[in-house]
């Protein structure tokens, strides 16, 4: 939680300081190792002796009050409620659409407590692991590499398989439509098997998704 507090401070203030449980910005007693009067004359948070009391980021964010925040791979109500405080958008890669309905509802209610009016569909981003191929059989054959990797690595760290969007374009479109009928979705988040599939496999999958799946949802 504290790192989000630090990020929000940095995005909403020209300069800031933070003394927390895990993070301290700037470090206590920090001295600019490159003394020059320009820092104190034209900068902020720097004294003539080059001691630094506050830091900032530049250039400043274009969006107000700050760019959209995203919470990676939310799988609990607690996490959804945390991000709702900041109108941050959790990413939910869930197969269980009843679970998604609950997440969306809990998020909206919690966001309202902090004065955030959430547009339907902005409660969370929904999606999954995407492999798009000419046929369902071909996509499933490509998925075998992912299944092997997941069993050998993430699963042993307690990380379950995300929602699978694996199949031909029409199959993926039906999956997305089913989710969109359950909860409003404005953003679809796709995991792609970079590092496991070849460049050509991934590019073909993305091309099929972009030309055969997305047009089915254009306004």
Locations of the language-model features?
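C-terminal amphipathic alpha-helical "assembly" element
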Residues: 8, 91-108, 112-219
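Internal, glycine-rich beta/alpha segment that forms the wall or movable "lid"
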Residues: 1-81, 85-86
């Amino acid at each position: 939680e504290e790192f989000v507090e630090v990020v929000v401070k940095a995005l909403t203030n020209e300069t800031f300081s933070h003394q927390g449980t895990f993070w301290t910005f700037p470090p206590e007693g920090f001295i600019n190792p490159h003394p020059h009067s320009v820092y104190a004359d034209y900068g902020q948070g720097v004294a003539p002796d080059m001691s630094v009391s506050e830091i900032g980021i530049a250039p400043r964010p274009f969006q107000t009050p700050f760019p959209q925040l995203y919470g990676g791979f939310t799988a609990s109500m607690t996490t959804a409620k945390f991000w709702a405080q900041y109108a941050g958008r959790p990413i939910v890669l869930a197969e269980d659409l009843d679970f998604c309905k609950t997440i969306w509802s809990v998020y909206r209610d919690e966001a309202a407590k902090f004065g955030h009016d959430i547009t339907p569909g902005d409660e969370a981003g929904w999606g999954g692991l995407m492999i798009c191929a000419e046929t369902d059989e071909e996509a499933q054959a490509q998925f075998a590499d992912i299944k092997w990797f997941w069993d050998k690595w993430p699963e042993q760290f307690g990380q379950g398989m995300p929602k699978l969007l694996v199949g031909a374009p029409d199959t993926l479109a039906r999956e997305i439509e089913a989710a969109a009928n359950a909860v409003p979705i404005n953003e679809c988040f796709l995991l792609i098997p970079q590092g496991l599939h070849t460049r050509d496999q991934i590019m073909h999958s993305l091309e099929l998704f972009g030309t055969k799946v997305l047009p089915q949802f254009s306004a």
